[in-house]
Amino acid sequence: MAETINKSGRGVNVCKRCGRKQGLVRKYDIYLCRHCFREIAHDMGFEKYS
């Protein structure tokens, strides 16, 4: 039988940098996992307060 592709649920979206499915930051259509986001957030223009 042919494999079906999921079109909904948590596993559909992946990090566009490393492919991880957990801890995804989807706000502002960023689609990065939290690990990748922490590494490149400053380069994207985000600033860390205190």
UniProtKB/Swiss-Prot annotation:
Q: Which domain of life is it from?
A: Archaea
PROSITE patterns cross-referenced by the UniProt entry: RIBOSOMAL_S14
User: Does this UniProt record's set of keywords contain rRNA-binding?
Assistant: yes
A Pfam family cross-referenced in the UniProt record is Ribosomal_S14
The GO molecular function terms of this record are: rRNA binding; structural constituent of ribosome; zinc ion binding
Record-linked PANTHER family? 40S RIBOSOMAL PROTEIN S29 (PTHR12010:SF2)
Describe how the cofactor binds: Binds 1 zinc ion per subunit.
Q: Which UniProt keywords apply?
A: Metal-binding, Ribonucleoprotein, Ribosomal protein, RNA-binding, rRNA-binding, Zinc
Q: Per UniProt, where does Zn(2+) bind?
A: C15, C18, C33, C36
Give cofactor(s), names only. Zn(2+)
What is the role of this chain? Binds 16S rRNA, required for the assembly of 30S particles.
GO cellular component term, pick one: cytosolic small ribosomal subunit
Quaternary assembly? Part of the 30S ribosomal subunit.
Keyword set includes Transit peptide: no
Record's protein name: Small ribosomal subunit protein uS14
In the record, biological process GO terms are: cytoplasmic translation
By its UniProt entry, which InterPro entries does this protein fall under? Ribosomal_uS14, Ribosomal_uS14_arc, Ribosomal_uS14_CS, RIbosomal_uS14_euk_arc, Ribosomal_uS14_sf
Extract the Gene3D superfamilies matched here: 30s Ribosomal Protein S14, Chain N
Record family assignment: Belongs to the universal ribosomal protein uS14 family. Zinc-binding uS14 subfamily.
Q: Which HAMAP family match?
A: Ribosomal_uS14_2_A (MF_01364_A)
Q: Which organism is it from?
A: Methanosarcina barkeri (strain Fusaro / DSM 804)
